[in-house]
Amino acid sequence: MAVLTGLFGFFAYVRGAVSQRCFSTSGSLSAIQKMTRVRVVDNSALGNTPYHRPPRCIHVYNKSGVGKVGDQILLAIRGQKKKALIVGHRMPGSRMTPKFDSNNVVLIEDNGNPVGTRIKIPIPTSLRRREGEYSKVLAIAQNFV
């Protein structure tokens, strides 16, 4: 009987130790960083052809390594490396920056010109402050939020 009580005490101890550990199984709601899946929202041929793997960010061109709206990133898309501009992300941003349902990017060339000719979703008006850098991207946008 004493052995049985000792075993139950041990199992209660193990169960209590395991249940006290806290770990999350949900994904973090951060902005765009390395290996983040993104959605291409322009009408470029490279971004709209179906492929079995979604495009992923492989580098963020800023000091912190976390991309926000208006930052440039390097994508791995269909076995190629392409630059892209972030036009929306899921993480809640600063004031007057909308939160989107997905991480949206527009493919750009090395000189900053957009690859596509139309952007399918509304883009944030906060990009208008940087109009010198991204004036051609703003020109092909149809809606602003």
From Swiss-Prot:
Gene Ontology BP term (one): translation
Broad class of the protein's primary localization: mitochondrion
Record's GO cellular component terms: mitochondrial large ribosomal subunit; mitochondrion
Gene Ontology terms, MF aspect: structural constituent of ribosome
Function noted in UniProt: May form part of 2 intersubunit bridges in the assembled ribosome. Upon binding to MALSU1, intersubunit bridge formation is blocked, preventing ribosome formation and repressing translation.
Transit peptide interval: 1-30
Protein family membership: Belongs to the universal ribosomal protein uL14 family.
PANTHER family assigned: 39S RIBOSOMAL PROTEIN L14, MITOCHONDRIAL, LARGE RIBOSOMAL SUBUNIT PROTEIN UL14M
Keywords, sorted A to Z: Mitochondrion, Ribonucleoprotein, Ribosomal protein, Transit peptide
CDD domains: Ribosomal_uL14
Subunit structure: Component of the mitochondrial ribosome large subunit (39S) which comprises a 16S rRNA and about 50 distinct proteins. Interacts with MALSU1.
Record-linked InterPro entries: Ribosomal_uL14, Ribosomal_uL14_sf
Subcellular location: Mitochondrion
UniProt-recorded name of the protein: Large ribosomal subunit protein uL14m
Pfam families: Ribosomal_L14
Organism: Rattus norvegicus
Lineage top rank: taxon: Eukaryota
